[in-house]
Amino acid sequence: QKCTMTSLCAVNPRWKAGKVPGCAYLESWHCDITEFLELRKNTGDDRRRTHDMNTANWIPDLFMKRMEKRGKWTLFRSNDVPDLHDLYGKRFEEAYENYEIKAEKGEIWSHTIKAIDLWKQMLKMLFETGHPWITFKDTCNVRSPQDHVGIIHSSNLCTEITLNTGEDETAVCNLGSVVLDSHLASDGTLDHDKLKETIKIAVRALDNVIDVNFYPTEAAKRSNLRHRPIGMGVMGLQNALYMKNIPFASQKAVEFNDEFMEAICYYAYEASSELAKERGVYKSYCGSKWDRGILPQDTVETLEEERGESISVPKSSKMDWKVVRDKIAKYGMRNSNVIAIAPTATISNIMGSSPCIEPT
């Protein structure tokens, strides 16, 4: 990790926007996890610290189950369990438990700790340093629209995108964000016509970027041209709530959040499908969840089936999704990924708006 951070720092003088962004992810079963958690601490041996690199936990559901039951958690060396990196859900659980049996027999190295103790350490470091961030491996993979062509091994610097990566492909995503407070009518309601037109233009523009972009590696170019992911996000939620005279921490704010995000998703999916009619579907479309008629909101049920328990999230909708579903079934999708809520810390200042969906 220290070598990676040093490489990032070496590029900093050429990065006009500030420090070069970078983030390292580590799975919770890795034998170095306890040291990894302390990489951003301001105390201790500085040779074991990475002050200029972000860190994130990549947590499987099995760890959370063990933690809730106050059970044990086994750490392994990655070279002893090479397939765990590429497994998730029930297949991961089966393989992990088989490795635990091998470890008990002394066939491979292991170290056993209490799952609750590791979880407490994760939270302690998060409160003290803001790192490592908490991300969930199984949720990202089970709900991925591209589950037919690879595995998601991490998110990105800001945890807003989850794309497949591998030795031959480096995930790349082109991001853009709608200024929400510019899409309210004079009476404070959401201007659907304006929002639809903005998103239609933005999706086309982001798709164009894929073809004209500069790629530092062939793996990045190969991935982007094959899957064509884009990330439509939003900024200005706090400004919009202020204009509507709605407190940020209120039920009305939650309801408005559901309303505008449903609209953004609706118009973005529709725009990508219409673009597919014009330009063709992305190369790896066949076999994807889009191709199978499964939209992102449908994957909550997929995750419930995987976990064998209900997930308490609102599942109602206000818009006629049959229209979008029919278009996708007929024309397909131009982009494998469409929505991503980026932090917009810099561009929101340029636009004179509040950052993403956060209060300021």
Provide a role label for each language-model segment:
Residues 1-180, 184-192, 215-221, 268-289, ...:
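Active-site cavity-forming subdomains of large catalytic enzyme subunits
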Residues 38, 148-149, 229-236, 266-267, ...:
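Short glycine/threonine-rich loop-to-helix capping motif typified by GTGT followed
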Residues 137-138, 177-179, 340-343, 351-354:
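Active-site proximal loops enriched in glycine and acidic residues that flank catalytic Cys/His/Asp
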Residues 163, 185, 336, 346-360:
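Gly/Pro-rich active-site capping loops and adjacent beta-alpha segments
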Residues 175, 237, 345:
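Hydrophobic, well-ordered secondary-structure elements that form the walls
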Residues 198-221, 247-344:
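Internal maturation/activation junctions in enzymes
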